[in-house]
Amino acid sequence: MEAIFYRNGKETPEPVKAELSGTIPSWLQGTLLRNGPGLFSIGESSYNHWFDGMALIHSFTFKDGEVYYRSKFLRSGTYKKNTAANRIVVTEFGTLAYPEPSKNIFSKAFTYLINTIPDFTDNNIINIIRYGEDYYASSEINYINQINPSSLDTIGRVTHPHYDDEGNTYNMGTAIMALTGPKYVIFRVPSIASGIFESIIPALRKVEHICSIPFHSTLYPSYFHSFGMTENYIIFVEQALKLDIIRLTTAYIKGVSWGKCLKYDKDDITLFHVINRRTGKVAGTKFYTDAFVMFHHINAYEEDGHVVFDLITYEDNSLYDMFYLKNMRQDAETFDKSKVGCTLVSGFSAGLELPGINYKYNGKKYRYFYGTKIKWSPPKNKIAKVDTITRTHIEWMEDECYPSEPVFVASPGAVDEDDGVILSSVISLNPKKTPFLLVLDAKTFKEIARASVNTTVHMDLHGLFIHQ
């Protein structure tokens, strides 16, 4: 794996005007926000896992046919503590932070004691989500940080959500210490309050509980990164990749990162929980299959009395192991890549990840989805458009380039599902080739423009487009 993934990124706090080739559609006005890890060492200390790096927020702003780029590190509590100490002092997924060497034995003992049940980081590296009119950096932790989508400034601390046609946001979390027992919690955040006074109240203060689902295994909550939603149902996959709570409570004392507290049981089952969006009631029928690992689902919809749920799955959890930095530094040709499990479309010799759709079709029957094709040996990354009807795909690639998650933006008044553009941030292995924002015609997957920026751009994970 190339060093461009795990080298320290740099901020570009002021907007940089991009050099254009091709023509940006005149209707494309707004900002593409991106999020991902961008700082992998602080002082003399370094992180162990790619998902540990400090969050770096990026934006590409489209205005009157021009494109402007800027980036800033998320000023989370974790970032502030680490930079103030000039070392890693907050534990992350794959990196355990220890007491300062200068502390005496009593201070160290107290630190171990208070970390028995760890207060997790607020380093939100995964995504950008919208609650009402507010935008937040988020990840698989209990805290989120609000950001200003224009300046990228961090407003303050307050995972893959869904939005319905009314603009409401749906998300889920866990309540491990609930009085009625540990459970998964699904909630809704209304879009905009109707009253003048209510409209100034942050959307998160109006959160509505939809339902709670008890853990299948009391001391082993399932890992989840996304869930599905149709017109009438929410679908949650309780998979066999689980967090060992007992091991977690002793992890700090034993010197184990919480990433090592995840365990996969190939002999376990995978449960599908189907919840009525209106009533919050969980379907009485139990749906289950063999064990697998899932990070992203593509889409879900209802057809002929059935719920169709399209997933990207793996036979084990080795995908996470692949992103330990010691593994990323290995030669790509010798790396034992994760095997892909079930796939919707045959013919792929590489993994397909970071799927996206025309969000107008979220929860509805759809035809196309877009994703990143990852092939570690040789390292040729591509983005692809998949036709689920014909079971064919078309792709874009360029030598020495790594495109990020493709984001679909629909044309104004679009009728066809694929009438719009695809946006992808692209970095290169070649230091002489500047990073650029790629704009593709979503129908043909042909390049119509690129916006090259003469500054450092880092690889990211997820994001969204804000129309203006």
Region annotations inferred by a language model:
Residues 1-468:
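Beta-propeller domains
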